[in-house]
Amino acid sequence: MAKDEKWGIANIYSSYNNTIITVTDITGAETISQWSGGKVVRADRQQASPFAAMAAATRIADDAKEKGFVGLHIRVRAPGGNGHRSPGPGAQATIRALARAGIKIGKIEDITPIPHDGTGRPGGKRGRRV
């Protein structure tokens, strides 16, 4: 990593309903670009698909290159809390698409919020009765 190379942070929020990608500078203070699966596909049911995530990632890569970024550190987040702890189908597709677009990939970290014995899951004592 040379001194004159410009790096940023790509925050990927991937749920089973959508994938949202936000690129910030290395401090995280200034947002460079933001795209989601819902912005690039027409049907709501396709928002969370890997195709939508790849399309959003290529637009993110173009915006980042335009601003002079050479590489991105990746921060992947799932809904977490009382929801799913694993990211949706768009997370892996996003990272692959960024790498294919010519962006260098730095650190990849998982920032999913995990409760440390907070509130209980919805459903009550006996669970959801169907």
UniProtKB/Swiss-Prot annotation:
HAMAP family: Ribosomal_uS11 (MF_01310). GO terms for molecular function: rRNA binding; structural constituent of ribosome. The lineage of its organism: Archaea, Methanobacteriati, Methanobacteriota, Methanomada group, Methanobacteria. One of its GO terms (cellular component) is ribonucleoprotein complex. InterPro entries: Ribosomal_uS11, Ribosomal_uS11_archaeal, Ribosomal_uS11_CS, Ribosomal_uS11_sf. Part of the 30S ribosomal subunit. Belongs to the universal ribosomal protein uS11 family. It comes from the Archaea. Keywords: Ribonucleoprotein, Ribosomal protein, RNA-binding, rRNA-binding. Residues 109-130 are annotated as: Disordered. Located on the platform of the 30S subunit. Gene3D superfamilies: Ribosomal protein S11 (3.30.420.80). One of its GO terms (biological process) is translation. PANTHER family: 40S RIBOSOMAL PROTEIN S14/30S RIBOSOMAL PROTEIN S11 (PTHR11759). This is Small ribosomal subunit protein uS11. It comes from Methanobrevibacter smithii (strain ATCC 35061 / DSM 861 / OCM 144 / PS).
